[in-house]
């Protein structure tokens, strides 16, 4: 296993962190996967196998597997494994609605994890709405109290908003010691992106990368054009490894999280991590990745560059997010996943709120007929 630096902290994390969001589950009475029923034997074997091979960071959250993941982590880390890793957990900031909620939720997490202290604690999934919850309900003050009395050791946040919001959150407090952002070779300019990574690293925060394979989309159902480019590579790598090595190649990345769901995934990711290092990919290989990125973008039906000139929408429609979901569904052929993400948008932000006022179309540098695409996106994504 390779180990890397983590901001200013005296902790060297494994290049690969164990993300516990996509664990193997049992089948319910209806014959469908029951995401609340983690397959304890298989999932535990996966985690312990990863730790035996050097993984030393385990990431969970209050909401994962319908609030059953934290309890599984506690059980899986028995028999001496707890002492060999750091555990990260996350505050569901949207559930904090009144004084005392933060402490109550944290107490529940400590109980589920069977611990007195969570080493790495994140405010979960910060975007504009969730950051508003943090500010309005004094969650930073509550977190500072938890740091002071030892219920948590280090504070960070995971992020799903715009770059400007990322800047604002970083500047809001000196309590941050690390953050978690989405980054992969398709998303250099999305959300916090590469700029956010460099900004946070410049402030000596540890930076964890999530979604390095875009939820698996960069590793499966590859278009023939993409397969042909990978076949040209002088070094043979799977599409998943290309995606992971692209992230590990960046010196500012502390480590990445992989949401592994089978023992095969664990074995493969451990193998990839063992040969990872910053600067591993040479210029010709990075150019190959760029060609793949360009091919995927050519497959997207809407020429949106996520410049966000269309925002804010007078009706509150999340225009760039909706266009991205529509494009992703067509680029990667994973329609059900994008429809699921569409449900995460507030109803007031969805495409059916568009009134075709045309204000966004006047601002769009690409000349996109946004109102027409909103109608198509609503019909397609609302399913």
Where are these regions (language model features)?
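N-terminal binding-site loop/beta-alpha segment at the start of enzyme catalytic domains
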Residues: 1-85, 142, 148
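Glycine/proline-rich, positively charged
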Residues: 27-29, 34-35, 94-213, 221-226, ...
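Structural motif
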Residues: 49, 53, 112-113, 150, ...
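Structured C-terminal cap/extension of enzyme domains
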Residues: 56, 195-383
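Short catalytic-loop micro-motif centered on adjacent basic/acidic residues
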Residues: 57-63, 153-157, 180-181, 255-257
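Short, electropositive alpha-helical surface patch
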Residues: 70-86, 140, 173-179, 270-276
